[in-house]
Amino acid sequence: MVLWILWRPFGFSGRFLKLESHSITESKSLIPVAWTSLTQMLLEAPGIFLLGQRKRFSTMPETETHERETELFSPPSDVRGMTKLDRTAFKKTVNIPVLKVRKEIVSKLMRSLKRAALQRPGIRRVIEDPEDKESRLIMLDPYKIFTHDSFEKAELSVLEQLNVSPQISKYNLELTYEHFKSEEILRAVLPEGQDVTSGFSRIGHIAHLNLRDHQLPFKHLIGQVMIDKNPGITSAVNKINNIDNMYRNFQMEVLSGEQNMMTKVRENNYTYEFDFSKVYWNPRLSTEHSRITELLKPGDVLFDVFAGVGPFAIPVAKKNCTVFANDLNPESHKWLLYNCKLNKVDQKVKVFNLDGKDFLQGPVKEELMQLLGLSKERKPSVHVVMNLPAKAIEFLSAFKWLLDGQPCSSEFLPIVHCYSFSKDANPAEDVRQRAGAVLGISLEACSSVHLVRNVAPNKEMLCITFQIPASVLYKNQTRNPENHEDPPLKRQRTAEAFSDEKTQIVSNT
C-alpha cells in the first residue's frame, strides 16, 4: 500500500512523494492501526497533504511546471529596473541533474528518455563530459529527475539493457542572455506585476510595437531585446500617435536598430514594397484581404476607395478582375503603382490619387453608368471596398443619388464592403445604425456584419456588407427610410451569433 503526499517545506517548491509500507496487508475496506497512525502524523506535519493511495515507491514532481520553470530558468533578480540593456548582467548558474553515458549509445538512449531529458530552447541536451572525452552528459529535467528512483520502469529497463548506471550527477550550467526568451527578459526587467510586451507586428525587417505608458521608460531596452530575439528583425519602432491624419500613416519612433523604413513584405503570395514611415500597412489584415478577394469572380469589377499600397487591389486583379484603385496619400499612390508592376497586374489596375469622395463621384460614377447600362448578359458583379475604419462610414453619403437614368435590376447593384470601428456593447448593431443613418435607410434586414478583429479592449473592427439600394443610388427614386424594395444580401446575423464569434476570436487572439 502506498500513500501519496504533497510535501512543501518552507522556502521550497512542493513535490509529490509516494511512501510504501511493505508489511501492510492490502484491504479495500480496512487500513491497519499502525498505518492509520502514520497517516494522522503526516497530516499534522507542516506542509504535508494527503492525496490518495498507490502501489509504488518513487518521487514525483509537482504539477505546476510553468511556475517552477520560471523559478529556475529566469534571469537574475538584480536586473529588475534596468533601462539600458546590459547583456552580461543576465549570467546565472543553475544546478542540473545529468546522466553519464558512453557517447556511442547517446542517440539510441535519447529516444527512450524524452520524458526525462531537459526540454529547454537554446540549451543543448547532450554535452561532452569535461572529465572523460569518451562519455557524454545527458541534461535531465530538474523538476522530474531527482535521484535514480525518479526514472520510470520503462526508462530503467532501457538503461539496464544499454548497461548504463542510473546514478544521477549534478552539473553547473551557466545561463546567459542568449538562453532567455524575450518575455522572460522583459518580465525580469519591468516592475513586478506589470504587463510585458512580447508581441509585435512584423513588417519585413521592422518590428512595430504599441508600448503602454508604464513600458516607455524601458522602450529602448525593449526594442533591442526584440531585435536580439527575433532573427531578421533589424529595426524596432513604436507608434507615438493615433492614425488620425488624412494620409492614414502615423508618427513613429525608432527604439533600436537601423533607421531604414524601406521594407518588403510577402502576404498571401504577393510582394509589396513601401516606406513604412509614410504609408499604412497592417499585417493583421492578411486574412481579411483574402476573405474579400474570395468573394470576387473572374470578370468582376472592384472599386478600392482607400487602396493603400494594394493589398486588396492586387490579389483581386490577379483573378482577372478589373480594378479601380485610389488613395489620397501620394506615397501610397506611388507604391501602389510600383507594386502593381512588381506583381504584374499593372494592365488590370487603374490607379488614382484622389480624395475618397472625389473618387466616388468622379471615376466610380462614370464607370458605374457604363457598367450598369450594359445588357444583362454582359453585366459583371461590382464591389466597392472602403477600408478606412475611422471614417469610411461618412463617405457612404457619396452614393446618395449618384446616378441618373433608369435603375438597373437589383441583382446588379454594387455591393459595398465598408469598414468601421466600434466601442459599442453591440458593435454589429452600432455599425448598421450608423451606416444606415448616413444613407437615410434601414440596413437592419439587408446587410451582414463581419467581425474583422479585436483592436483593443472594448474596441472592434468590423466590415458591413450590403447592396446599395436603387432608391439611394439613383436620383428621382421613391425612398422608404424604414425599408426598400431590394432583397437582402444574405440572412441577417443575430446579435447572439455575433457575440459568439466575438468571444471565439478574442479567445484566439
From Swiss-Prot:
InterPro entries: MeTrfase_TRM5/TYW2, SAM-dependent_MTases_sf, TRM5-TYW2-like_MTfase, TRM5/TYW2-like_N, tRNA_Gua_MeTrfase_euk. Transmembrane segments: none annotated. Keywords: Cytoplasm, Disease variant, Methyltransferase, Mitochondrion, Nucleus, Primary mitochondrial disease, S-adenosyl-L-methionine, Transferase, tRNA processing. It comes from the Eukaryota. Its EC number is 2.1.1.228. Residues 478-509 are annotated as: Disordered. It catalyses: guanosine(37) in tRNA + S-adenosyl-L-methionine = N(1)-methylguanosine(37) in tRNA + S-adenosyl-L-homocysteine + H(+). The keyword Nucleus applies. One of its GO terms (biological process) is tRNA N1-guanine methylation. S-adenosyl-L-methionine binds at H289, D327, L328, D355, G356, N387. It is an enzyme of class 2 (transferase). It is found in: Mitochondrion matrix; Nucleus; Cytoplasm. GO terms for cellular component: cytoplasm; mitochondrial matrix; mitochondrion; nucleus. PROSITE patterns: SAM_MT_TRM5_TYW2. One of its GO terms (molecular function) is tRNA methyltransferase activity. Monomer. Involved in mitochondrial tRNA methylation. Specifically methylates the N1 position of guanosine-37 in various tRNAs. Methylation is not dependent on the nature of the nucleoside 5' of the target nucleoside. This is the first step in the biosynthesis of wybutosine (yW), a modified base adjacent to the anticodon of tRNAs and required for accurate decoding. Belongs to the class I-like SAM-binding methyltransferase superfamily. TRM5/TYW2 family. It is linked to Peripheral neuropathy with variable spasticity, exercise intolerance, and developmental delay: An autosomal recessive mitochondrial disorder with multisystemic and highly variable manifestations. Affected individuals suffer from a peripheral neuropathy, with distal muscle weakness and atrophy, and distal sensory impairment. Additional variable features include early-onset hypotonia and global developmental delay, poor or absent motor skills, exercise intolerance, poor growth, cerebellar signs, spasticity, and seizures. This is tRNA (guanine(37)-N(1))-methyltransferase. The gene is TRMT5.
